[in-house]
Amino acid sequence: MANIITRRSILGAGVGMAALAAGGETLAQSQVRGDASVAAPRLPIENGATLRILRPVRFVQPDEEVFRASAARFSQQTGVQVRVDFVGWEDINQQTAVTANTGAGPDCIIGFGDSPHIYADKLVEVSDIAEYLGKKYGGWMFVGEKLGKRHGTNNWIGLPFGGTAGPLVWRKSAVKEVGYDAPPSDLPGFLEMCKRLRRANKPSGFALGNAVGDGNGFANWLMWSHGASITNESGAVSVNSPQTLAALNYQKELYPTFVDGGTISWGDISNNQAYAANTCWVTSNGVSLYFALKNDPATRAIAEDTEHSVMPLGVANSWPSAPLTLNAMVFKHSRFPNAAKAFLTYMMEQEQYEPWLNANLGYWAHPLNAYRASAVWTSDPKITLFRDSMNNQFWNGYKGPISEASGQANAEYVLVQMFASVAAGQATPDAAMREAERRARRIFRRG
């Protein structure tokens, strides 16, 4: 869907402007404090500048309304015509690739995490605006800096906009029924809880299908909580390790405790459906599942019985989860790079960003420290945990550099299929690990 914004169309923004106005009222009581003494970079907007912006579709309606309204206000203040296209999540990577490889299309894409690293040579450096925003708003959180900077440099090639993590989602009543106040934070204890839930006919379930978010997220958690990784710090393939073998053996014990029929065919919405249907009582998911349950009278009772907590750490020092991150890029083919950078800066200033963050109900978490004080994080105690999603110390391709190869390994579900083959009884843990190593070596040699 597209939206052309001009000076004349400002008044047609409708509900979006109303949403932004409501956000402005919230700002009057905001606890977010930016440093007004930090000087903004000088970005003289090019004569006759127009912009086309591409980003993923909304999670909740106010996301789009507030985003469009803020873009409209940018047009009003600068005279720059802005077109905003919202495209499906499954299409954003493909459209990013086409734009980068053809040198034509949107001036700016707010894509997903590793895209700027894949197409770094096609992008305008954005260090000036990233450093300004960091200084003004308390510094960048770990994932924001990790995904924003080109590996091994201080040069910013992306501008992280927000991220969403997938913690443990669980039913209080079921967990209490099997003897716990909350899921154990250690791996043996968590396995024992899942066994008890299975015996109580209230099983857990985690995706082992080719699911972009949930499948990769679960496989990564299994790896990282055991100290395993697909590559080491230098980027060499490291999947063949005692730690990976331990993760596979753990999953071999865990999988029989899952829902009837198993989860090898689960996609990204399968666990949502099973949880809402009372066939799965513990899973992992973003905040979307909770709000979908809360907003439907038929499932509101499930939402009231739902809690979130960090997945068991195992040997990790922090939550072993890599947030799915929105990461903005400005392309070299744009005739108006200053206008594009000015737009992104404007959208991340408090007057625009905080209402947008609050409107997303916790689905997207901020990458700048000052926004920890935003009202959304205390609006419902069940979502406060998501506030620090962008400070998780993990990323896709951990422990190595973010690269085209690390993105490809994720896209080809190398780790997911390794665990799934053991769960299905198609391979022993050792054989599955060696096959994953073979695939990873092919990908990282090519990358």
Predicted region positions:
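N-terminal secretory signal peptides and thylakoid transit peptides that target proteins
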Residues: M1-A18
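Hinge/lid segment of periplasmic solute-binding proteins
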Residues: S30-I45, F112-P167, L191, A303-S309
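Long, aromatic- and glycine/proline-rich binding clefts that accommodate carbohydrate-like moieties
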Residues: A36-A39, W140, T306-V310, N358-V414, ...
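Conserved C-terminal helix/tail region of periplasmic/extracytoplasmic solute-binding proteins
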Residues: S37, L43-E46, Q81-V82, K176, ...
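Extracytoplasmic "Venus flytrap"/periplasmic binding protein-like
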Residues: A69-M141, S173-S185, N272-A274, N278-V282, ...
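A structural signal for short loop-to-beta-strand junctions that line the ligand-binding cleft
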Residues: V98, P106-D107, L133-A174, N317-S321, ...
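Extracytoplasmic/periplasmic solute-binding protein
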Residues: G148-F161, G166, L191-V237, C280
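Glycine-centered hinge/linker elements that transmit conformational signals in sensory
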Residues: C194-R196, S234-S265, M311
